[in-house]
Each structure stands twice: as C-alpha cells, then as structure tokens.
Amino acid sequence: MQYRDLRDFISGLEQRSELKRIQVPVSPVLEMTEVCDRTLRAKGPALLFENPTGYDIPVLGNLFGTPERVALGMGAEAVSELREIGKLLAFLKEPEPPKGLKDAWSKLPIFRKIISMAPKVVKDAVCQEVVIEGDDVDLGMLPVQTCWPGDVGPLITWGLTVTKGPNKDRQNLGIYRQQVIGRNKVIMRWLSHRGGALDYREWCEKHPGQPFPVSVALGADPATILGAVTPVPDSLSEYAFAGLLRGNRTELVKCRGNDLQVPATAEIILEGVIHPGEMADEGPYGDHTGYYNEVDSFPVFTVERITHRIKPIYHSTYTGRPPDEPAILGVALNEVFVPILQKQFPEITDFYLPPEGCSYRMAVVTMKKQYPGHAKRVMLGVWSFLRQFMYTKFVIVTDDDINARDWNDVIWAITTRMDPKRDTVMIDNTPIDYLDFASPVSGLGSKMGLDATHKWPGETTREWGRVIVKDEAVTRRIDAIWNQLGID
C-alpha cells in the first residue's frame, strides 16, 4: 500500500492497530523518550502524543519502531519484500547492457517507470498553509524533545535537510540532528563527508561570504523519509526513489524564501541560511552508541521562515544504546543491502548488521569460498563498495554453512576456523565515525577483518578438519520412535 503523506500513513497504521493515540499529557523533556523506549523494546505501536505538556502540536514517536512498519513505509507488506527493493537498487547502481533485443525490451519498463517518477512541482502546497516570518519565527512553538538527562538542550532529530551545491543538478536530502540554541537558531551537525556538508563547502568556494540556502522538512511522507536513509545510486534523486516506493510522483513545492524544493505534503518546513563562518559548539547528546558524545563545533542554521500545515504534527525520535529506532531501521534496511552486495559479489550468500553493534559498526558475511584469499577480498569489498559501510569497524567473513544471524554459529566459526595472527586483517588510519570516541583520533581509526572460513591449501599446511554430520537414516529412525521413548 502507498501513502500520500504522513497523515495517510498514520491512518493506515491505526487501521492495523499499529498506532496508539496518547491523550494523557506527556512532556517532551525526558518523558517521551522513556515512553517510546519502553514501547519499542516491547515491539509496540507508533505513538501519537496528542497533548504534549506545554505545547499545542502533537508529537509522533516510535514511527519506525518495528521492521514491519519500516517495510510498510517503503510500500511493502512484509520485511522480506525489501529484498526486491534492493534488487532494483542493485540494477540501477550497476545497470548491465542488454544481452540482446529481447533483454532490452524486458528492461525498458523499468527505465520508463523511473523516468515517469520524476518529482512533480506544484504551486500550492499544504506545507505552506501557515507562514511565519521574521521576528515572529520562534522554534519554541515546536515540542522538540530533550531525550536524555545529560543532553544540553532540545534536539530536532527527524528533519530532512534539503541543500543544493552550486555544481550539482539535483538537490541532496540528508538527516542531520539539529540542536536548538535560540528562537531562530539551530546547530547543523553534519559530518564532512555527508552530502549537505559537501554542498556547503562547494558553495563557500564558489560564493565566498554569501549565505548558503537551507531548508528542513519535518513530517514528510514515509517514502520520502526512508528514501533519504536508503543507499540510492547517485544517478537517482531521493525524491524520484520515493516516487518509486510510493507508486506515484513526489510532489514538491518551491520554498517561499529560496529556490529549494521541499515535500509539498510535509507537516512543517524550516527555511533559512547558514552564514559562512558562523559556528557553535554542539552537544553533548546521548547518541546511538549508548554514550554522550563529545562537544564539537558545527555550522549554525538561521531559520528565517517557518511554514506548516494547519494543525501540524511534529515527528520526532530519540537515539540511545540499541535497540532504538535507528537500530530498527538498520535491521530492515539490511534486507535492502543484501541484493546490492550480491550484485557486486555473487559469492555472498548473506550479510548481517547486528543491531547491537550500533547498526553498522560490525558486519557478518557468509560466502561460497572459491579460492585462497577470497574471504579477504570480500571483506575489503564490503568496506569500499558502499559508503554506508565506511564506518564499519569489524567485518567477519564465514562460509555459507554458517548462519550469519546466529551468534552461536558465528562464534563457533571464529573459534574453530581462525588463527588470530594469520586470519586477522588490520587496517590503520581509515575513516571512522566522529561519534566513535574509542578511536585514537576523531574521525580516524582502524578496522579489523576476521576470516572465519575453512582454509584452503596455500592458506594452511595442515589437513583441515571435517565437520561432524549426523547420519540421516538414523535421524529419521529416531524421529519415528521418539514419542515411544518417553523422554520429555
């Protein structure tokens, strides 16, 4: 099923008993985090806080708190269907030339569908039903959460930041947390390699000293939100991909104060600029690692205009030690990653990002090994093929007889098929998540690869052990008489 906007998604979830309206007053300061955290851990519903303490705007939380709701948001009825989305992205990332006329005709509908999903620009949009400008702008109207006791202040978490570099044809969508530091000021915490930061850097080089236009959409439709966190090929815009997920074109509207285009059905839009050189210390905040991050300096976004729907809904989340909402997103998107990796490395049989590993810091890969050194090639490929795995610190590679999603299996493979010195790959001075305080230098650290595969001649001089396998005939015989044995 496809959802036109966030309200349509809320209605659909409610019909499935996947959303609960909370009428009891709950504060966005710490209390909503506690309620959402308990609900997520219980695999409970999305929550619509209709009476946030001190505010008139409802807060939507725990929206993507189960993999099933992530799948629904991407237009799928089951998590398993996300593999098909991954296959489409794999095809778009590395399209193969047609093998003949028949093959060309078979692929034509895919390209036609992609072309037909180009965003549609509209003149009038519900996200601009109410316009607040100038001195009337006050972010204090929004029920922005303060999530943890040690947080320095309220934090916008689910904003889709829209930017456009001076040398690019299309806009970039990114989700960056934003610390509220005044009635019209937030700190834009984007890392140097992210799209928004790259657009800003190019702008400063081409237009030194000039304000950089930025817009932030809050409460977009689920396909657009999830499109911003999916590994979309550079040749495809997030808006077009959202159209593919939704089954109809993404409607955009030009902002009132700049040329950026934002989702027309979003709940709230923040428009403004970043003045080059205006920086502020951000944090500390509790984050997805389960720790408070260190304070660092980032650009300040000045909000010049707020537009919103009549009676808007504020979409929010929290991040903390897994499981949290980003970890659940990671579990679902894991299914999208598998076909993309298999397109490049057909020998891969499964790929798993354990959510307890902060969603991306550890990966387990199973493969059909074909030659000595093959496992090392695959682990190096994981680190380099998709930028989403740039910060993956540990890659474990095992044979395809191991269940990548079963720690009992994985640990058995590590302890029986590895020699620590021979089968461990260490790489120094690689990009590491800025939030990873365990690295010796901020943003720079090491990576470890573990080859837990059977070793081939050339990798070992010893005879390799044979796995114990039960006799199938005996197993069937005991199955047949098991109840007669009287063993509970």
Swiss-Prot record:
It catalyses: a 4-hydroxy-3-(all-trans-polyprenyl)benzoate + H(+) = a 2-(all-trans-polyprenyl)phenol + CO2. Binds 1 prenylated FMN per subunit. Mn(2+) binds at residues 172, 238. One of its GO terms (cellular component) is plasma membrane. Gene3D superfamilies: Single helix bin, UbiD C-terminal domain-like. NCBIfam families: PRK10922.1, UbiD family decarboxylase. This is 3-octaprenyl-4-hydroxybenzoate carboxy-lyase. It comes from Pseudomonas fluorescens (strain ATCC BAA-477 / NRRL B-23932 / Pf-5). The lineage of its organism: Bacteria, Pseudomonadati, Pseudomonadota, Gammaproteobacteria, Pseudomonadales.
